[in-house]
């Protein structure tokens, strides 16, 4: 390494070891029954509103929502929720395409997973057409010939745009081309683009020349003619003669995989596009001499009832003008529009597009004069609307052109055509409501576009929180139909109550209790069931994890002796759990009539919230009991207890009592585990050991694969573990005695002999004295002599 003259400062890693990061102590795991939720998936929630989002709100007969709300209201900050159900199926619906046949499958779900149960039967989905791009087509001509074009110097064409008085003179010169005798469509288009701002041109995928107007309307028109003034005619070489020289003849079928558009905004390669025309009738004759008034025509639109269009002398200031005629028709038009073509003749158009769009003119009934001839419609042949769907192939933003994959089945008159993308909007609603729970706009059924409906709504992070989608036509080639507009209800959602086996679950499939295997929790509760089998499994699960603790309660209706009998089988020498009784009374959030304003619930969630609150304020080594351990939301208890009752429950049954304390409220009044070994008697001791184990386990991962020598052992002992334990001691976790009397660290050659080192073992031993709670307060009150004397005066 080269150094500069002067002071050079280098940063190196040094010999410091990572410090111990305190492990979390109060993330609660809840196994619950709930209104909804993806079964057997541990979902992280940080508020009750989060819980409602994923699992629904309160439901009669279930305690999960009450427990979770109690947890957060009592100081909890983070929980993992697992929904348990018996046999369950999601609600479903099939959305058909307009032409029939299934287009989209819908299931009740959450972020791409099935969310089964009866809750989904209250959902419906509404589909609305929602094209993300719709564009009109300007007048355009596709030349018949294919490049190269045999042009000569000083050749050209004249292009009349929208019946302008003077045509645009397009002239070709040798300098415009690499080889004018073998001119390309792109080279010719570049010359045309420079000729006038009213024209634009491009090359088709088949190497034809396309010329387009820059405006799109019924009056948009292009006509190509031979040039004058001694300029060589290039129209024949380009293929711009006869029908191919007039935009009114439409885009010819042979070359109809491209169109100039008014705007390509919103079109994407791979998207589905619908190319539509609308029913129209164009007057072949100019407006003639006015008839005797009243006069009129009957216009039939899309096969409906005839619309009577009538003209009176009062519609005109004098001799009828085209503007007055248009205004009179527009005042009466229903379902159709009227405009003028480039030559000034009239055109009537249906306001609908595609198949079924029709318009026809007939003489009026009765004494009204027939205005057909006056308006120029004598001999007019109506043209029905058409439509064809295809896949967008390319987008030319600069040239404003769109190409698609296959040729049209019929010629396309740009004046009455549009191209729109095929997208839809899907709204999810609750039954009986018109306000959507969520709405997804711009969805497509094309699999290779970003807005493919199943991809968007099934996204695991940003997808729908109510439904999942499936494509019954996945893998089918070409354009797939969108679901037809309309509202469809979901149905068939069902569920049964979970069995003990469902609550316990399987380690192989990570269901039930084992759904928590992949996440960190330090507390565990199952407020829905007090089944002995489930409680035993939960206690065993926590013990096997070694970092968590179960909190349970006896069933409602048990008296003190019944509670002790219930808890007896769960007691053992070393148990990772605690029991609390009796049930607590809270306000009933489901009561809207005042008939049942309060209800009893198991205290599990509220107790875990107190655990979290007191650990955050005082440290995990502080017993979560006493006057500070108030259960917020609790209005009462199932039965009262005297001091003697509490002592009996705690000493004999190892069950912690919840009772009303005057001046304090409803409090947790003891902190025993179910352990019979006095070393593991208290909740705070169990929690402190779990905390120390987890913290050291997390922070000593750096030791793996390090060279095992005395230097490593010293780093671990003095640089990592010692500062951590000193920090806990200074906060009171080990009492007030000197540090060397309350904890010991052993990490040296005595517990890492060469034989173990050779086998890859690294042994660290930590011993500490956990502070115990003052559980029985003994106050002695007695009299003493005052020492005063009396005397007679």
What spans do the regions from the language model cover?
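Phosphate/oxyanion-binding active-site loops and adjacent basic polyanion-contact surfaces
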Residues: 181-185, 318-322, 495-509, 716-717
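Peri-functional-center coupling elements
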Residues: 177-179, 183, 462-464, 474
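Structured, hydrophobic secondary-structure cores that serve as assembly/anchoring elements
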Residues: 1-92, 429-434, 477, 484, ...
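Polar helix-capping/helix-linker motif
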Residues: 446-452, 462, 531, 709
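Extended, beta-strand-rich, solvent-exposed assembly scaffolds of outer structural proteins
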Residues: 50-55, 70, 90-139, 143-454
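Long, low-complexity, polar/charged, intrinsically disordered or flexibly structured peripheral segments
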Residues: 470-504
């Amino acid at each position: 390494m080269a150094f500069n003259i002067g002071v050079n400062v280098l940063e190196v890693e040094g010999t410091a070891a990572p410090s111990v990061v305190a492990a979390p102590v109060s993330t609660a795991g809840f196994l619950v029954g709930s209104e909804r939720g993806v079964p057997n998936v541990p979902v992280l929630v940080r508020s009750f509103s989060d819980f409602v989002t994923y699992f629904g709100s309160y439901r009669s007969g279930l305690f999960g929502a009450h427990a979770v709300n109690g947890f957060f209201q009592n100081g909890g900050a983070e929980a993992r929720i697992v929904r348990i159900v018996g046999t369950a199926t999601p609600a479903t619906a099939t959305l058909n395409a307009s032409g029939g046949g299934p287009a989209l499958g819908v299931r009740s779900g959450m972020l791409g997973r099935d969310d089964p149960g009866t809750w989904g039967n209250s959902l419906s989905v509404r589909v609305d057409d929602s094209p993300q791009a719709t564009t009109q087509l300007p007048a355009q001509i596709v030349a018949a010939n294919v490049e190269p074009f045999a042009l000569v110097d000083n050749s050209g064409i004249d292009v009349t745009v929208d019946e302008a008085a003077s045509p645009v003179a397009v002239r070709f010169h040798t300098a415009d081309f690499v080889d004018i005798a073998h001119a390309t469509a792109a080279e010719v288009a570049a010359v045309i683009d420079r000729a006038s701002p009213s024209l634009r041109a491009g090359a088709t995928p088949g190497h034809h020349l396309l010329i387009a107007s820059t405006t799109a309307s019924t009056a948009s028109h292009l006509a190509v003619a031979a040039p004058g003034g001694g300029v060589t005619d290039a129209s024949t070489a380009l293929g711009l003669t006869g029908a191919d020289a007039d935009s009114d003849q439409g885009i010819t079928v042979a070359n109809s995989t491209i169109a100039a558009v008014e705007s390509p905004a919103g079109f994407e390669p791979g998207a589905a596009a619908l190319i539509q025309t609308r029913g129209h009738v164009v007057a072949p004759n100019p407006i003639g001499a006015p008839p005797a008034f009243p006069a009129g025509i009957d216009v039939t639109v899309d096969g409906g009832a005839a619309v009577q269009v009538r003209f009176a002398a009062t519609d005109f200031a004098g001799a009828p003008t085209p503007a007055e005629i248009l205004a009179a028709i527009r005042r009466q038009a229903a379902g159709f529009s009227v405009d003028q073509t480039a030559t000034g003749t009239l055109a009537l158009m249906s306001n609908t597009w595609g198949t079924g769009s029709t318009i026809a003119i007939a003489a009026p009934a009765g004494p009204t004069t027939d205005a057909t001839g006056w308006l120029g419609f004598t001999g007019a042949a109506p043209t029905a609307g058409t439509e064809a769907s295809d896949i967008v192939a390319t987008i030319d933003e600069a040239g404003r052109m769109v190409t698609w994959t296959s040729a049209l089945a019929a010629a396309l008159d740009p004046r009455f055509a549009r191209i729109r993308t095929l997208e839809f909007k899907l709204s999810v609603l609750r039954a009986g409501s018109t306000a959507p729970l969520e709405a997804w706009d711009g969805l497509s059924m094309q699999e290779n576009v970003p807005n493919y409906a199943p991809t968007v709504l099934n996204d695991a992070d940003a997808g729908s929180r109510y439904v999942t989608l499936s494509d019954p036509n996945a893998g089918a080639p070409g354009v797939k139909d969108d679901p037809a507009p309309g509202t469809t209800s979901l149905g068939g959602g069902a569920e049964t109550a979970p069995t003990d086996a469902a609550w316990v679950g399987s380690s192989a499939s990570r269901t039930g209790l084992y759904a928590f295997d992949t996440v960190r929790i330090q507390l565990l509760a199952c407020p829905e069931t007090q089944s002995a089998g489930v409680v035993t499994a939960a206690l065993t699960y926590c013990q096997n994890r070694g970092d968590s603790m179960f909190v349970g309660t006896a069933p409602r209706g048990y008296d003190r002796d019944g509670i002790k009998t219930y808890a007896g089988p769960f007691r053992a020498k070393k148990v990772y759990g605690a029991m609390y009784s009796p049930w607590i009374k809270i306000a009933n959030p489901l009561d809207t009539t005042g008939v049942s304003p309060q209800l009893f619930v198991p205290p599990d969630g509220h107790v875990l919230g107190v655990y979290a609150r007191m650990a955050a304020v005082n440290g995990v080594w502080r017993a979560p009991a006493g006057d500070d351990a108030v259960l917020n939301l609790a209005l009462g208890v199932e039965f009262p207890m005297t001091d003697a009752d509490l002592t009996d429950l705690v000493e004999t049954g190892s069950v912690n009592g919840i009772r009303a304390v005057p001046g304090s409220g409803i409090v947790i009044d003891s902190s025993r585990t179910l352990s019979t070994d006095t070393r593991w008697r208290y909740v705070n001791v169990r929690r402190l050991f779990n905390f120390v184990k987890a913290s050291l386990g997390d922070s000593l991962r750096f030791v793996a694969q390090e060279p095992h020598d005395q230097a490593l052992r010293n780093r671990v002992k003095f640089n990592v573990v010692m500062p951590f334990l000193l920090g806990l001691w200074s906060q009171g976790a080990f009492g007030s005695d000197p540090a060397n009397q309350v904890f010991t660290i052993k990490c040296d050659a005595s517990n890492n002999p060469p034989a173990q080192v050779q086998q890859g073992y690294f042994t660290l031993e930590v011993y500490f004295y956990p502070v115990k709670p003052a559980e029985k307060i003994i106050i002695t009150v007695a009299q003493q002599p005052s020492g005063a004397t009396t005397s007679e005066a």
